């Protein structure tokens, strides 16, 4: 079954690891030798690393081998005889997630705490998913009715998986976003964890004390919980201004975190990268420990400035929450911006408009475009301002000031919009 599963899904790291360990186990049994899981795991890792050295930096490789390592090293610390199989499953889940914590935070920047319970419920059901799916394939050739029963059973089980995951993701605290820790933090975490494992196994050979085992279990749990909290604090305690210009190809996206801790995004889109919000902007925000953006500014309605923001708005339940979407003045809105505003409202995000002279927080001020709304005067002149066309020349211009540091965020400002900004005198202040 494992071989055919590998053929069907392709040579994924986890499948290759399972297949190689299975062959080593079978070889040991055929030759009459004892099966040594740590040796089997090490040999498999060596074979795959020789085949593809870059696997050592691959998240899938590290997660697959880390899960088995957690069962081999950490689970014995929690292992105590009990009649409750569910409790045993929880301890295995805790051991696996504890070993994978550093990898999860480094590559995915967050921890799903309810996964401890979900694994206890869902993993035991996986053999039934496999059996009903394979049964549906085999029996569909003999009897269409029997095949449909197998497929429907498999579909119901997978639907149960989806519903349960959706339910837990909607619960408070379903995601702990910590940001990406430094590599030294990951090394220290695994150093402490492996030291505790070594100490436990060394003492276990000398004495079998349940109190000591319980103490080690508690200590490991404290290390895991403390590491999550510590990583989150390290990524959110900076009091300095942070400005990051993201590489989104042909497009624009700028992230700002001011001294007060407010997080803002100015534009977010690309014309040559697909799903830029999902695969470029959101992962960056999570890597910085950003759970919520106070403001998302849109300078104008071109696709290479807004399509990523649209993805962020629609994925707030699973991604980064947006408090307020800030758009150009109403007289400069086009159909794309109005559509974006509707998406924001549908996803319970406030929609604001910003005008020249208004501030967002302490450090960000809008200086363009000028509008009739406030009857701005151009250097004291009373003549009516020229009408700008919605789009590039009416781009929102933001001024970022922090002490001696100044930065202009101009969108795609051009033509009469540039002339108006220069004549307004806003650049002289």
Q: Regions from the language model: what does each represent?
A:
Residues 1-116, 181-236, 419:
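Hydrophobic alpha-helical transmembrane segments in multi-pass membrane proteins
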Residues 22, 115, 133, 278-279, ...:
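A generic alpha-helix surface/boundary motif
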Residues 22, 41-45, 130, 163, ...:
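Generic alpha-helical secondary structure signal
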Residues 52, 101, 123-126, 327-328, ...:
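Hydrophobic alpha-helix-in-membranes signature
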Residues 81, 86, 138-429:
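Non-globular, low-confidence helical/coil segments that flank catalytic cores
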């Amino acid at each position: 079954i494992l071989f055919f599963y590998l053929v069907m899904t392709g040579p994924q790291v986890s499948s290759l690891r399972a297949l190689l360990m299975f062959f080593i186990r079978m070889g040991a049994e055929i030759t009459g030798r004892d099966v040594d899981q740590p040796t089997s795991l090490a040999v498999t890792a060596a074979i795959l690393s020789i085949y593809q050295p870059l696997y050592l930096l691959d998240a899938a490789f590290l997660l697959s081998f880390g899960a088995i390592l957690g069962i081999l090293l950490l689970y014995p610390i929690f292992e105590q005889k009990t009649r409750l199989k569910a409790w045993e499953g929880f301890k295995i889940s805790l051991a696996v997630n504890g070993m994978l914590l550093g990898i999860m935070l480094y590559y995915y920047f967050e921890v799903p705490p309810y996964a401890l319970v979900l694994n206890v419920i869902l993993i035991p059901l996986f053999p039934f998913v496999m059996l009903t799916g394979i049964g549906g394939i085999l029996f569909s050739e003999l009897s269409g009715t029997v095949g449909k029963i197998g497929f429907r059973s498999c579909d119901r089980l997978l639907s149960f998986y989806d519903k349960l995951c959706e339910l837990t993701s909607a619960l408070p605290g379903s995601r702990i976003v910590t940001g990406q820790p430094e590599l030294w933090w990951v090394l220290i975490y695994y150093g402490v964890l492996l030291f505790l494992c070594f100490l436990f196994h060394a003492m276990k050979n000398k004495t079998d004390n349940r109190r000591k085992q319980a103490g080690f279990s508690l200590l490991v749990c404290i290390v895991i919980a403390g590491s999550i909290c510590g990583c989150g604090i390290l990524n959110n305690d900076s009091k300095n201004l942070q400005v990051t210009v993201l590489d989104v190809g042909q497009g624009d996206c700028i992230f700002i975190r001011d001294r007060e801790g407010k997080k803002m995004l100015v534009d977010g889109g690309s014309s040559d990268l697909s799903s830029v919000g999902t695969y470029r902007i959101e992962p960056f925000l999570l890597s910085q420990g950003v759970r919520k953006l106070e403001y998302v500014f849109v300078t104008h309605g071109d696709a290479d400035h807004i399509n990523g923001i649209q993805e962020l708005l629609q994925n707030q339940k699973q991604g980064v929450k947006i408090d307020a979407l800030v758009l150009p003045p109403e007289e400069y809105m086009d159909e794309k911006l109005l559509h974006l505003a509707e998406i924001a409202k549908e996803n319970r995000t406030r929609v604001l408009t910003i005008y020249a002279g208004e501030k967002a927080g302490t450090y960000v001020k809008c200086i363009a475009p000028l509008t009739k709304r406030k009857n701005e005067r151009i250097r004291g002149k009373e003549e009516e301002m020229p009408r700008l066309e919605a789009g590039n020349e009416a781009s929102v211009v933001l001024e970022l000031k922090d002490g001696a540091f100044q930065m202009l965020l101009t969108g795609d400002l051009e033509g009469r919009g540039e002339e108006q900004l220069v004549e307004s005198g806003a650049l002289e202040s």
